[in-house]
Amino acid sequence: MSALDGKTGSGSLPLVERVPPHAFFVGSAIFHYLGPSFAVLLFARVPVAGVAWLRIVSAALVFALWRRPWRAFLAAERPAQWTMLALGGVFATMNYCFYRAIAELPLGTVAAIEFAGPVALALAGARSRRNLAALLLTVGGVYLLTEVRFGGAPHAFLWAFANAVLFTFYIVLAHAVSRADPSTSPIDRLGASMIIAGVAISPLGFSAAAPALLDPVALGAGVVVGISSSVIPYVFDQLAMRRLPRSTYALFVALLPATAVIIGVIVLRQVPSALESVGVLLVAIGVALHRPPA
């Protein structure tokens, strides 16, 4: 039995149960944007749609070889199957929109915009002055970010805002998948969703990725992007979501915009301006302040 699923020895806790859920979240936060920063570097060799395809399909292959997740899909009840199908569709479209956005905008800017949706969703589900203030702060931060760069790449912001909407669906569906069926592992359900995403994105991305399949360097880089972007962070997300209350998880999510900025500076040399830094800070405060519905 895998240490992700069961006991590691007689009477002992599974290995993952001995790791604090906060540690999984920190690992997820780092890899969530480290992988895309590598993808930006890969854009010089492979078109955006091709990189998105490489990311998702390589992750799907890892899950297929590691977990054989179709068994969890076939064993699940019909509502859980629909949830996995929906999450797979969101994975495919969200990653494509995200890559189209970061191809032209700084990673930190796209990451900050990403959180407008979850904060708005929190206000819709739990109307309070706290959530209203959180939304106003987030909107103010996003406004500053778009004001700085909108004139240079207006269409890129359309992709960024589409990604924000899809990221909201990801949070809702990923929480549902993590708790969908106690008889199967959440990692297996995640893997099934990733395979579905690979099928969904193939009509759009395969032809763009085809040249990379004959280029060992580009292909290897694509696999690294897939593992660091769609295997490690999503697995860590599932392990954190399963043990953290939604309110606590939402608070930790406030760290992600700052994480994206730091990785953008280190890996991509994307140093934000003073106004952009204020925008990211406002978004982070807004995300930390908001409280999702119970």
Predicted regions and their residues:
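C-terminal-most transmembrane helix of multi-pass membrane proteins
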Residues: 2-8, 56, 254-294
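Hydrophobic transmembrane alpha-helices of multi-pass small-molecule transport proteins
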Residues: 63, 116, 129-149, 163, ...
